Amino acid sequence: MDDPAISSPTNKHFFVIVLHGHKSSPMIPAEFFSTYVEGKNHQSTKLKLTSDAFDRTWEVKLNGRRFAGGWENFSTVHSLQDDDVVIFREIGDMTFHVTASGRSFCKLQYISSDEDRADEDDAWNVYSDSKNIVSKKKPRTEAESSSKNYYLVAHVTPSNLSRDRLYLIKAFARSNGLNERCCEIDLMNKHGKSWTLGLRYSTVNDQASISGGWRDFCLVNGLEAGSFYRFKLVQNGERPLLRLCYDTIPEEDCYKGNRKVNLSESASMKQGKFLTMTFKPYMLKSGQLRLSRPFAIENEIKEAEDITLVDKNGGNWPSYVASGDGQGGKYYLAKGWRSFCAANRLKTGETFTLEFVRGEGTTPMLKFCSKSKDKIEQVPFDEGGETQEETETRVKKRARVSAERGSSRRNQASNKPNADPQNLQPGQPHCSISDQVQKVKQIIVDTLTGIKRIRSELERKGQKLEASILEIDALGEKVSEINKILK
């Protein structure tokens, strides 16, 4: 029997991503909430949730748009992981059928908890061929286990980048004969350039992985940590080949039989049009919004193209696309970004989402959708909001500039395109000249302090060397006395 929640294309639906690093309480998207939920006594609204995994219904309370009482129990029972995509389809009045899609956008199987998983943040990174989500108590059939599945969705994480290793889920490796093999494997980018890595198999945890070049491949091709990228197994012989692709996965390769469901396509397309990131200090200081090349390519964003930033109140901020230098360079928006941030009152650590909209005959738009105060793990910053490396670079550069050019530094700063006064709101806070002078003074003082500390260390080392010379002289005198005695 077909899943009633996903067989009808007219059903209203939305999807959320379980946030990383905490017990997440997802929020219903604002547009969906205002259209279909708001006004139904939402202060005491309860949602009824069903799934394929269990023959029962859960009640989940809403606190505004956020899931509250009952959600933690539902997510625990269904073994939801960090960064899982969860699709909600309405099948009745305030009743939703829930499909957990793992870290890909197709449905996954619930695998028994005692099955080894070598790496938690790489566990659900493959398109599943299963027809339905099955219960933990229902074993997979031989047909399900042996079915071919050529698509892999890799979740790039800080951990697999630092280890230079990507683990392959067992179902994908087994169905394509990649388990229990040790050989070379090629990763190809969309331009046809290949990187040779090693395919390895661990008997300890029955896990296949690729290593020895994964970090370099991600760096050169602009694959960012926290993002998902699709690969297709296009060659499987003595030397397998995985090709990076940005196009939508064909429906027939993701599902079997006569099912006419385009869940993976629709979810993937929606995900490709949304840009979710955490607001960090450098975004405001640089005056730039950086766009990854995969996001730009998927949405056909081109260099020098005009784009309008639309804030939460509908205000427009004209901008344009520029490109960084070098292979794997990124696109970025500069003009209007600071004013856009001020209009939406973005603060450090907040997660926000932008939707890319391209209409026929109109300028493309990046619309502000929502933001959350739930902070995710960030790189440590100093009191000025910069990393230690950025601070050291800034100290050296500003000290040199202030010594060489003096007051002309302020005139240059006022001529930067990122500080265009037309893009700043009248009430936007700014640094006064006295504040800038004080900052430069403090930088110089800090630099001098560092120089004095280095000089002090050199003096101490010099004293140690002088003491060593005296010891050597004394030793030489003793040697001379011994020689005289021997003669």
Curated annotation (Swiss-Prot):
It comes from the Eukaryota. One of its GO terms (cellular component) is nucleus. Residues 11-104, 151-247, 274-371 bind DNA. Keywords: DNA-binding, Nucleus, Repeat, Transcription, Transcription regulation. Signal peptide: none annotated. GO terms for biological process: megagametogenesis; pollen development. This is B3 domain-containing protein REM2. It comes from Arabidopsis thaliana. The gene is REM2.
